[in-house]
């Protein structure tokens, strides 16, 4: 990984503050020093807490950090929420990143997908490849568990951070994505996180919230006072019905409706 990064000369790292991109930014900084910048897209699909973590990490690492506004909701092609939504969004965001990187004299834009990402429906990867974005972690053959282990060795706090996907992934394909829906999802997930649930997804099915949490935490959510608090708060947020997914949290559950 280090040798490959050095061969790129200078890089702009697509940085979301997640496990993979944090490790990649640290590895790039170790390999290239001041020939690295971080780029983060600010969007209503990206919670403020994640943006703040990105800002804090780049400050600690002393890496220049450019934050730009992505306006995917203004793109009707995206907001109508087709099955290739991720492709549309990634194409727009990474096109902007390439423009910024070019203006700042960076030779390549790199991003943090790993080899495990090849096993799910990931239309966003097509946009990355079309635009010539480099994926060093995939090039090095690194899987998620290895990235976590290496992050721990490097002393990165994100080594055990829970996986996160953009808030738009909580809305079923074909149902329009709106700022209001994204805000409802964000508020409901913030509630669950504040109550001690570690891995959470609140899927937005119009007036119904479908909650996914790790099965190990089912006993906590089944307590009467916990259920009542979640129900009442979700009603205040705007949902009418609140349900628990009996299979628990799983990556890409919205893709279960697709024939891929």
Residue ranges and their predicted role:
Residues 245-252:
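A short, acidic, flexible beta-alpha connecting loop/helix-capping segment that sits on the rim
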Residues 1-153, 194, 209, 225-239, ...:
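ATP-dependent adenylation/nucleotidyltransferase module used to activate substrates
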Residues 111, 138-144, 148-192, 196-201:
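Mid-to-C-terminal catalytic subdomains of enzymes
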Residues 198-205, 245:
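C-terminal boundary motif of the adenylate-forming
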Residues 252-260:
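Short, low-order "capping/linker" segments at domain edges
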Residues 85, 177-180, 222-225:
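Alpha-helix N-cap and loop-to-helix initiation/capping positions
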Residues 204-206, 210-223:
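A short interface-forming secondary-structure element
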